[in-house]
Design a protein with these regions (language model features):
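Short active-site neighborhood of thiol/selenol oxidoreductases, capturing the structured segment around
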Residues: 38-59, 65, 157
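Sec-dependent N-terminal signal peptides
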Residues: 3-12
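A short beta-strand-turn-helix
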Residues: 24-46
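Loop/turn elements at helix/coil->beta-strand transitions in domains of secreted/extracellular proteins
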Residues: 43-46, 73-76, 100-102, 129-130
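Thiol-/selenol-based redox modules, centered on thioredoxin-like
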Residues: 128-169
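Boundary at the C-terminal end of the N-terminal hydrophobic targeting segment
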Residues: 15-18
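Structural microenvironment flanking redox-active thiols in thiol-disulfide oxidoreductases
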Residues: 59-98, 106-115
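Short, internal strand/loop/helix patches
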Residues: 95-128, 133-136
Length: 169
């Protein structure tokens, strides 16, 4: 039994430290212009958050993500839209309306989502300049951001920007 637990722990730890792509690229959801975010160019690190144009949970986190971007200006933020069941017109209209202060990249074939093994929204990652995943998890503890009791992404960013090891990975 101990061996099984050790194996599971090592597997999860390895995946957290695994290399990720050197960049994310695709077209903007709002104007279709090409976008390319290279992690090594970030001042501190890059937050990647997978969002949906139709998910109420994702939508409830938009104001909170705007606040986080304002709170952590030296951190690069980028959103990825990978939901293939959401048409381009709906997606474009939604992301224009919410007006995020960072790029939203359309991931038409879900290649970015596959590379990060992202399968829900909102889901976030912090990627270091060395292309290592420092944090993977929810943005908050609730499907509705305003009802959250824990703010996972914010705590991870506080740990990172204050030179501490990220407690929650």
């Amino acid at each position: 039994m101990r061996l099984v637990i050790l194996f599971l722990f090592m597997t999860m730890s390895f995946s957290l430290l695994a290399d990720v792509p050197l960049m994310v690229k695709g077209n903007s959801t709002t104007d279709q212009s090409p976008k390319e975010i290279t992690f090594q160019k970030a001042e501190i690190a890059t937050v990647i958050v997978f969002l949906s144009a139709m998910c109420p949970c994702s939508d409830s986190h938009i104001p909170y993500l705007k606040k986080l971007k304002e709170e952590f200006p030296k951190v690069t933020f980028v959103a990825i839209h990978s939901n293939v069941n959401e048409d381009a017109k709906t997606t474009e209209a939604y992301f224009k309306k919410v007006n995020l202060p960072f790029d939203v990249i359309q991931d038409d074939e879900a290649k970015i989502a596959d590379a990060f093994r992202a399968n829900k929204t909102p889901h976030s990652y912090i990627v270091s300049k060395e292309n290592k995943i420092l944090y993977e998890g929810g943005v908050t503890s609730s499907a509705k951001a305003h009802q959250a009791s824990e703010f996972f992404l914010q705590q991870a960013l506080l740990d990172l920007t204050q030179g501490r090891e990220i407690k929650q990975k």
